[in-house]
């Protein structure tokens, strides 16, 4: 049972997933820092409000408060993360397309050898 577990863990997909989760966790911290320390102050500068985007809110009554700043912060984090993932996927797809094109290109030597084979077969028949 232990050897089966080891085989399962050492499979490429599981290792790739583990690396992705670890890098994703680290990347989340970077995106949050970018949003909180760079983007939020810029937005705050233009809105003239609180120094933290998280604290933006709309108070309707004492009991009813809409904390739209926290939502905006999460939307910004999502958009940054989604954009970076998009760029990463686009980059990987470009690499895969380039590799496929290289595989598809026929070797000129093989074409010449095929022509020679065809000529030899034609001579045998004649």
Curated annotation (Swiss-Prot):
Keywords: Cell membrane, Ion channel, Ion transport, Membrane, Transmembrane, Transmembrane helix, Transport
Cell compartments where the protein resides: Cell membrane
S-S pairs: none
Protein name, UniProt field: Large-conductance mechanosensitive channel
Gene Ontology MF, one: mechanosensitive monoatomic ion channel activity
Subunit organization: Homopentamer.
Keyword Cell membrane: yes
Function description: Channel that opens in response to stretch forces in the membrane lipid bilayer. May participate in the regulation of osmotic pressure changes within the cell.
Stretches that traverse the bilayer: 14-34, 69-89
Membrane topology according to the record: Multi-pass membrane protein
Top-rank taxon: Bacteria
PANTHER family: LARGE-CONDUCTANCE MECHANOSENSITIVE CHANNEL, MECHANOSENSITIVE CHANNEL MSCL
Family named by the database record: Belongs to the MscL family.
Gene assigned in the entry: mscL
Assigned GO CC terms: plasma membrane
Entry keyword Transcription: no
NCBIfam families given in the database record: mscL, PRK00567.1-3
